[in-house]
Amino acid sequence: MLELNKDARAIVAAHADKALPVEGVPALNYSREDAVYRTAKQAALALGFIEIDAECVALAWQAQVQRTGRFDVQAWPDEPADFGLRPWPRDDAFPACPKSLGLYAVLPTALWVGRMARAGVPTVQLRFKSDDAAAVQREVQAAVDAVRGTQALLFINDHWREAIAAGAYGVHLGQEDMEIADFAAIRAAGLRLGLSSHGYAEMVRADALSPSYIAMGAVYPTTLKRMATAPQGPGRLAAYARLMRDYPGVAIGGIDASRFGEIRATGVGSLAVVRAITAEADPEQAAAHLMARWAA
């Protein structure tokens, strides 16, 4: 068991809603001598945050105490400046999208994109997986064509070059894509940019690019994609949403209608669904039900 000082134990007790199971005894690696930093690092690791996220929390807690002049175990850090985020407005920001993207359907083909756009889903994403460059180009163009005449906002997952060429509304990229994407070209083309995140360190990294929105998750267990981090849960999602309040936030991962109340309570304005639509016998009816539940 990780040895905690008294204040670290108090932080853990006060923020049990953010706790995830801890496997083994996490190593305590300190980058600073500051007592507040060390206390917060202990607490964050005990709550199950991975090392890089625990470091972010610890540094932010130290900055919070330096800024306010007081240490309060109840005051989980959520001030952007304490995490080193730049103030808004920003000259280098990507084009804005609606603060609430509503129901956000992640779909495998252009055919699905067209069906959900015509069903009134406000935001759709084409997540088309293929190693055939020509097939990708055709599918992206077909998705752009499929949303014409509807109010749906179309994001293209991964394929940013094809999204630019086809004139999509935006592109969504994962953290791994940030190493290779030409963000200057995406911005110059006027596309909106959505970025995935799975914890504090990745949110801070995403913020450096001033994207149009930030997706946060996975909130609940999902079988659709192998995740590097454990499901974050609604407690952490609420903390992430408070920190990233200047962005439209999108909750993703294992979400269905039964979870809407928990998601809404976090303050996140949008939620992404996959199987809650594509696995249903009547996807259009399922989409209508989900939109009505989210709006209720």
Predicted regions and their residues:
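N-terminal amphipathic alpha-helix/helix-capping segment at the start of soluble metabolic enzymes
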Residues: 1-111, 185, 239
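Catalytic cores of alpha/beta
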Residues: 154-169, 198-212, 242-250, 255-273, ...
